[in-house]
Amino acid sequence: MLKIKLILTMIVCIYASMAHALVLEDLVKDGKLEATLSQKKIGYYIGSFDPPHLGHEDVVNQILEQNLCDYVLIYPAWGGDEYKNRTDVQVRLEMLFAAFANHPKVIVTKLTSAELQGVLMKRDESLVAGKPSVKTTFIGTEYIGVIGSDTALETSKDLKKLSVFMRGIQIPEKYKEHTIGGIIAIPVQSFIVSLRAGDSIDSLKGVFSDRPIVKTISTDYIDLSSTKVRKIIKNGSALDKSFVSQGVKEIIEKYNLYQE
């Protein structure tokens, strides 16, 4: 029995060492995108990820372990919006690729929001908030929005934002490389909400933007945020393994991020 357990452990370790995130551009290039996404549930996880921390990774792990989604597509805010002080998107993308390097059910990409929409969506005849819309290109693909409770609570107060949030609107020229482009690029049918410390979404009554909240997730890192990580670094404190993964830590050190 012990020998069998050792063999199984070795197999798991070998598989883990070979596992890696899926790069959307590679799926397109290799002609595997449709086979990968058809009849699948895809979590669409957008955020600043400045930097991506262990709380983000835990949210993704829980979604996949609980079979809430088949894959999770991670997409950073590109910038151009009211938050002017984000780290350059290319550096944040580098950190995301490092953070999720060994997650075989995670999809990462460096495509702009317009390129992302062009790959995953096709034009629809209907209008959303009076604007041309899009729908999924592949049969049976269902997208589920993954958002933080802060986003859910803040956005729920703004009817204008609610009317377009993750509804799949054809991206106009001015938003092709913009945070708003990522927000409107893909229509989601439901939401998974990650709870932040001190937040309650009871007031939403299980619905956000006229679509159901299918799951709320509490992580072991509920008090951890990108803001907290940045403050730790700025204050000169050590960034240990309880905050970010080793790959992300190395990139932060390489670029001397968050020193000011």
Task: List the predicted regions and their residue ranges.
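Nucleotidyltransferase catalytic core that binds NTPs
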Residues: 21-260
